[in-house]
Amino acid sequence: MTPANKSDKDRVVIFDTTLRDGEQCPGATMTFEEKIEVAEMLDGMGVDIIEAGFPIASVGDFEAVAEIARNARNAVIAGLARAIPGDIARAGEAVRHARRGRIHTFVSTSPIHLAHQMRKSEAEVLEIITATVKQARNLVEDVEWSAMDATRTPIDYLCKCVEAAIAAGATTINLPDTVGYAVPDEYRRMFKTIRERVPSADKAIFSVHCHDDLGLAVANSLAGVEGGARQVESTINGIGERAGNAALEEVVMAIKTRADVMPYWCNVESTMLTRASKMVSAATSFPVQYNKAIVGRNAFAHESGIHQDGMLKNAQTYEIMTPESVGVKQTSLVMGKHSGRHAFQHKLEELGYKLAENQLQDAFVRFKALADRKKDIYDEDIIALVDEEMAATHDRIKLSSLTVIAGTHGPQRATMKLTVSGQTRIEEAEGNGPVDAVFNCIKRLVPHEAKLELYQVHAVTQGTDAQAEVSVRLSQDGRAMTSKAADPDTLVASAKAYLGALNKIVMKHQRDVPAAAAS
């Protein structure tokens, strides 16, 4: 349905070639079942044309195209064919059961291709175009013809090829930037010139098909639309030969987001883009780069303190589209070394903490120190940090520094600095292992009778830089006190946990003495 205040002549037809050109990407082969699943997703999200494969390439490709053609509910199903009679017949057979089938046939037109690959003259190629397009048109009503390497083809000859294809019955004319050589203004002018110079141009829809060798595939695709093309060929996640194709999700969101300067529209349901991206990534085993536009993990993630502050005040300060518009649940404020105090406070409130000003500042300082040491900060890291901070507020004994020397030979040695009731104490001790050395050091610095009953370690989060959470239980005079502490360094976490339990024993003793005297 044409949207309000938009005309049908400004509709951009979205042609997806993930299952054909995308699968030609080395290593991106999909199984029969995966192709069917991807095709169902594309059909369901409003893609207009699905190029389901290259039927002559293999029995498996033929069967996949035929099955997709039988099951498609809305999309036109296209099969690719070289300008060879056998290819065209095979493609026609594959799509014959589709509600709407298309044969997409192509031939090279550039001088370098004609001389070194085709070994044909310009006149011979014109004859091939006429014959093969007519053959395809006898099999289906919808025929697309492509001029391979169009952007390196002289414009006069390209006009003759286009005219011949339309005269033979082509309903769509595709002018690909096969090797990703064009720049946007050049590509725009090519379409404009051909549509002006070919008398029958209004009898066909013009199509763009851009590769990303210079990183210009999406920009060139949009430029082609501005030049008069009304079909864009693209792939999910931009997968394809060499550097890939124009990414479908980027084309769609550019059209939707910049409707203020581009009066175009398309039928694709953008809220399904992220799901489609994940499906194709899983099927091809090609991970999506983190900073990939629209569907990358970081597309709606913010770590910079300045950006996070702006996002908390008004999301439009740093987001030009909503995450929900592409199927992402919400924006992510990533906590890291670049995060600011405002974002840290917001994260604490999300986690259920409301700290006093001095507690917040202390926790923020410790958070920044942790972020300098740890690549990924998870909610569990922040919870462990704040719980430890709140528990340590009234501690009499505090860890200032710890150095441990450990190795395969000889005893392990720990050197520790503690602040005890405001006074600094330094000591070193040996032990049967680094943890034993740390605990022996504490016993020298703060002599006590408490016995170690429990020592447990587990990782708070995943990864080699995960924080270790250590639990320690000490008992004295029949009473047991347990404390937990977390740190990327297991030995530091062990010292903090031990001191936490020891502080609880000290505080308990201080409360018990006045109570005994009063009785």
Curated annotation (Swiss-Prot):
Annotated stretches, region: Regulatory domain: 398-519
Assigned EC number: 2.3.3.13
Gene Ontology cellular-component annotations: cytosol
Domain Pyruvate carboxyltransferase: 12-274
Binding site for Mn(2+): D21, H209, H211, N245
Entry-linked SMART domains: LeuA_dimer
Domain of life where this protein originates: Bacteria
Molecular-function GO terms, alphabetical: 2-isopropylmalate synthase activity; acetyl-CoA C-acetyltransferase activity; manganese ion binding
Reaction it catalyzes: 3-methyl-2-oxobutanoate + acetyl-CoA + H2O = (2S)-2-isopropylmalate + CoA + H(+)
InterPro entries per record: 2-IPM_HCS-like, 2-isopropylmalate_synth_dimer, AIPM/Hcit_synth_CS, Aldolase_TIM, LeuA/HCS_post-cat, LeuA_allosteric_dom_sf, LeuA_bact_synth, PYR_CT
Cofactor(s) this protein requires: Mn(2+)
PROSITE patterns found in the cross-reference section: AIPM_HOMOCIT_SYNTH_1 (PS00815), AIPM_HOMOCIT_SYNTH_2 (PS00816), PYR_CT (PS50991)
Alphabetized UniProt keyword annotations: Amino-acid biosynthesis, Branched-chain amino acid biosynthesis, Cytoplasm, Leucine biosynthesis, Manganese, Metal-binding, Transferase
Biological process according to GO: L-leucine biosynthetic process
Locations listed in the record: Cytoplasm
A Pfam family it matches: HMGL-like
Family the UniProt entry places it in: Belongs to the alpha-IPM synthase/homocitrate synthase family. LeuA type 1 subfamily.
Subunit annotation: Homodimer.
Function: Catalyzes the condensation of the acetyl group of acetyl-CoA with 3-methyl-2-oxobutanoate (2-ketoisovalerate) to form 3-carboxy-3-hydroxy-4-methylpentanoate (2-isopropylmalate).
Name listed for the protein in its UniProt record: 2-isopropylmalate synthase
